[in-house]
């Protein structure tokens, strides 16, 4: 059975590029355009990993990450954060909230796949 990844980003093009790379690597993907939409997908999916943008409307990635870590079915699910900002303060917030990896946009699909393979056990 393929490992399932929730991909959360307000950019349809980022979701498309990342989704294609992940599916080609054998992962199943579920997608959401913002944190609030993604929260609605936590109960119905057994997720192995979550990849979330930081800067999104409605609910940003840090707020979403905090909610994920409080959610009974996903609190132990590793989360990779995507952002255009590489500042230490933002990284510290993400790490404190439970992020396991941080990828700066724009990124090469292989960079994402490398991070995913380190966090998902075969």
What are these regions (language model features)?
Residues 26-33, 41:
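Short hydrophobic/Thr-rich beta-strand motif most characteristic of the beta2 strand and flanking loop
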Residues 45-51:
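Active-site beta3 strand of CheY-like receiver
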Residues 56:
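Receiver (REC) domain active-site loop signature in two-component systems and cognate sites
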Residues 53, 83:
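Active-site residues of response regulator receiver
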Residues 63, 86-103, 114:
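Alpha4 helix (beta4-alpha4-beta5 surface) of REC/receiver domains from two-component response regulators
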Residues 33-37, 60-66, 86:
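Acidic catalytic/metal-coordinating carboxylates
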Residues 40, 62-75:
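Short amphipathic alpha-helix used as the core "switch/output" element in two-component signaling
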Residues 107-116:
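C-terminal output helix
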């Amino acid at each position: 059975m393929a490992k399932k990844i929730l991909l959360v980003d307000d950019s349809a093009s980022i979701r498309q590029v990342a989704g294609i790379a992940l599916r080609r690597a054998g992962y199943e993907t579920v997608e959401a355009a913002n944190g609030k939409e993604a929260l609605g997908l936590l109960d119905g999916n057994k997720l192995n990993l979550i990849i979330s943008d930081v800067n999104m409307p409605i609910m940003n990635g840090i707020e979403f990450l905090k909610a994920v870590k409080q959610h009974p079915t996903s609190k132990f699910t590793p989360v990779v954060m995507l952002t255009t900002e590489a500042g230490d303060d933002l990284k510290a917030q993400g790490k404190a909230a439970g992020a396991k990896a941080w990828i700066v946009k724009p990124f090469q699909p292989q960079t994402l796949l490398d991070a995913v393979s380190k966090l998902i056990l075969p």
